[in-house]
Amino acid sequence: MALQTTNTWETLAQLLPSRNHDQDFWWKVTGRQLAVLLEAAGYPIERQYNTLLFHYHWAIPYLGPAPASGVAKWPSQLSVDGSPIEYSWKWNTKSKAPDVRYTMEPMSEFTGTKLDPLNQRAFRELLHKLSQFVPDVDLAPTDYFMSTLFDHDRSVLMKAVDDGVPLQFSSTALAFEFLDKGLLLKTYYAPRKLETGHFVLKDWDTAIRGYYPESKALDIVYEFLKTSPEGELMNPYHLAVDNVKDGRLKFYFQSPHRTFTSVREILTIGGRVQREGLEEQLLSLRDLLNALTGQSPDFPEDGEPPIVEEDVTADLDTDGHPELMSGYLYYFDIAPGAALPEIRFYVPIRRYCKSDLDLAQSLTAWMAANGRGTYCQQYLDLVHSLAEHREISKDRGLQRYIACLLAKNGEIEVTTYLAPETYEQVRRSQKTAV
């Protein structure tokens, strides 16, 4: 039976005061969803309370207006339906329990107006407040990239608002990772020049090198992009930083190819990554991808898994980058002093699965077969709970991405990204009421 609520949620729902219509809506919906995630992942009761109280006091006030209809006033690219939040479930390994995280695009009453045409005011305000509350938060990378990645001629932006130029693209986001060691903050940046459109690699390089002037790992990334046939096809689209001292930088790219041959080339950086057990990891990863995309174990490495159905909503969550749904996504994880980057890749899985139930069953079957089945039933119950507004045996889209990283310890790190579908829930309830 799907877990619809938890004891921690019920207790807090009774004790925490009502604030206003908007915040009460987001707390009722996302607070309960987060509570179910934490319970399913086996978080101790104390950490469940701490995480939910953090969400209530810090995130809820910045989720913007409650949906008055099924259409978002400022549709966030974090989700297909425009919801300003996305959850992630980092799967357990043989020795470690799952981790829960969520990413949000902070919003306010001024989002999209002449006062805040790019919706960055709430992002900066929330970060400033958190820096005074959360230990070890470092806003230096945020200050730097906000000053170098975006247009700052406000007169141009305000004129664009007056002229009706569509500026509704998500340019910043903030992630909270609730770990055993404490809270980790990450910030995301997706710049776009008003006159010329998206950044090209040269623009990114100028900005990144200003903050990371000496990086062997970054040098390797650029060398790969210039010399590998696969690297030459990759398109940069945003970056993220850990907001701690000497934090990592994550540089995101899209590849148009969906073959495992392409995946192998990029994850090994053209053969530059070499270590014992790597080939076994790659073969296990291939098995996982074949299972997730519904292919047989002998599906050729140079074959592209068929798309179940063209995604007509692709534009809604890719910041005008519809090509981001046409291939696989990657990021290069640049750590200070590292000789090589780590690489994580993402499959926009809703394009390849028959239904959310089929995907969840395929994923949990692979986990169980690889000695990681401890939380499989909890995950299946979680998917049912988040999708109480629709049939997961017929619909798809709740599970948006599957991300994988070949860890140095021989494990494959797997993360599922889940959509709250708040606007979709409103749309469906309105249809039912008619």
UniProtKB/Swiss-Prot annotation:
Which BP terms does GO give this entry? alkaloid metabolic process
- For the ligand (substrate), the binding residues are 101, 248, 250, 252, 346
Which pathway does the database say it acts in? Secondary metabolite biosynthesis
Mind telling me which Pfam families this protein's record contains?
Answer: Trp_DMAT
Keyword Electron transport in record:
no
For the null mutant, the annotation states: Leads to the accumulation of the unprenylated derivatives violaceoid C and violaceoid A.
Sorted keywords for this record are: Transferase
Output one GO MF annotation: prenyltransferase activity
Q: Which positions bind L-tryptophan?
A: 86
The protein's superkingdom reads: Eukaryota
Q: What is its EC number?
A: 2.5.1.-
Report the top EC class in one word.
Answer: transferase
* Record-stated family: Belongs to the tryptophan dimethylallyltransferase family.
Explain the purpose of this protein: The PKS fogA releases the carboxylic acid (8E,10E,12E)-3,5,7-trihydroxytetradeca-8,10,12-trienoic acid as its product, as well as derivatives with one and two double bonds.
This chain belongs to the protein called Prenyltransferase fogH
